[in-house]
Amino acid sequence: MNTSPFKPLLIATLTLCLLAPARAEKGADTPEVAVEPVIAEYHSDDPAARVRVWQTQMTRTSGNPKFHEFQKQRLEEWQKTEFAPHLLDDPQITALLAEVIRPALVLYRRQDCFKLLVIEHHIPVAMNDSGVLLMLTTGLVERATSDDEVLGHVAHELGHDIHWRRTARARQTLELYERGAGTVLLMRRAREELAKIELECDAFSSVTLAAMGRNPGTFGKYLLGVARDFPDYTLENMPLDDARVRVIERVVPAAALSTRPEQSEALKKLKALLEVRKRR
């Protein structure tokens, strides 16, 4: 296992959420990504069949002999950052969140691959670090009205594990450019590739939710709500929100978008506990 290809994105995301807003016009410097090719590639009239293919492509990191050593290393590195104080060390809250997201993890045999870290912050963020750490903010859960929305974020993060090699190559290109190597053209192509991967992870999430009998549309609406309520918080190399929603809604059968969203007892208890913490 190599150092996380998501580490630069992880640092940028957490810095953005925990330290200061990035005030930039939405879309002013957003990489252009053709949405239709992504929709054409990922559209499935049989989501369950598509998921079976992905199940064969998804590596099980916990099966690696060095898994525990690597996970410990990644956790120790994370604990040295300025973000560690925001960790919500509450076993009950962590256990309830684990119960909510478990269906997506089990589907891809990832239930024993992640150390779940709950970050206490109001900005909704989910992040997969190296396939061994999974971080979700309390804000993500607090905004959710159904398990489907939370599972949509988690499935998106699982999708990154399929594309980690492409992500690593694109990130390497950007790092070289920042050091004065490479060309503007290569830099732009790398940014476009990262934005395309994000759309593909949205498609992965949508098809996965449909295969689970969940409503992918709730995930898309969630993204639009976050964009509306947090207009000053933007990330590099992310496609526009309306493009993300178009992908989410068009890669699955229309019937999937009318599925009734579910709210489990675990999510209800989790949201209640978080509400109590906010009142303290």
What are these regions (language model features)?
Residues 1-10:
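Bacterial N-terminal signal peptides that target proteins for export
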Residues 113-132:
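Catalytic zinc-binding patch centered on the HExxH motif and its immediate surroundings
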Residues 10-17:
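Bacterial N-terminal signal peptides
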Residues 166-190:
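Post-HEXXH active-site segment of zinc metalloproteases
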Residues 24-89, 95, 106-113, 121, ...:
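C-terminal capping/extension segments of zinc metalloprotease domains
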Residues 19-22:
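N-terminal signal peptide c-region/cleavage motif recognized by signal peptidases
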Residues 146-162:
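Short alpha-helix carrying the canonical HExxH Zn2+-binding catalytic motif
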